[in-house]
Regions:
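Intrinsically disordered terminal and processing segments
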Residues: 1-71, 75-135
Length: 135
């Protein structure tokens, strides 16, 4: 009977160690993905935009990353951001970061503070708008 208990305890220990190893590996993978996305977002093109130099019209911009594919139509009227329409939004943080559009329009600036909890998506939106009206 004592031998059965010992075998049972060894089985539980092995299972717990295996679960701990799986959790550590999953955590490492998650952290590595976050770092890769941060590196990718920080390498996006960001153009210094003077809205006073931008002619009235509609401009399309597209930014593709491994975590978010974004396509926007930016309307400039009287050197102000009049509207930013989302044409394509597919990926992580796309919907969560969408309120940054209203911030840009309200402040009439391309570079505005990121949406809390959707910082990487916010960077993609900023890059997409700056690319649209700069090129």
């Amino acid at each position: 009977m004592a031998e059965k208990k010992r075998i049972y305890k060894n089985d539980i220990s092995s299972v717990l160690m295996l679960l701990a190893l799986i959790c550590l590996m999953a955590g490492g993978w998650y952290i590595a993905r976050k770092k890769a996305r941060l590196r990718e977002a920080s390498s996006l093109p960001f153009y210094k935009v003077e809205l006073s130099q931008i002619a009235d019209g509609e401009y399309e911009g597209q930014t593709m990353t491994s975590f978010l594919h974004l396509k926007l139509k930016v309307t400039v009227e009287n050197h102000q951001l009049k509207d930013i329409e989302v044409l394509e939004n597919d990926g992580i943080d796309g919907e969560t970061a969408k309120p940054i559009i209203q911030k840009m329009i309200d402040e009439n600036k391309v570079v505005v503070p990121a949406i809390k909890g959707a910082e990487l998506g916010s960077l993609v939106y900023i890059s997409c708008v700056s690319t649209a009206i700069s090129l």
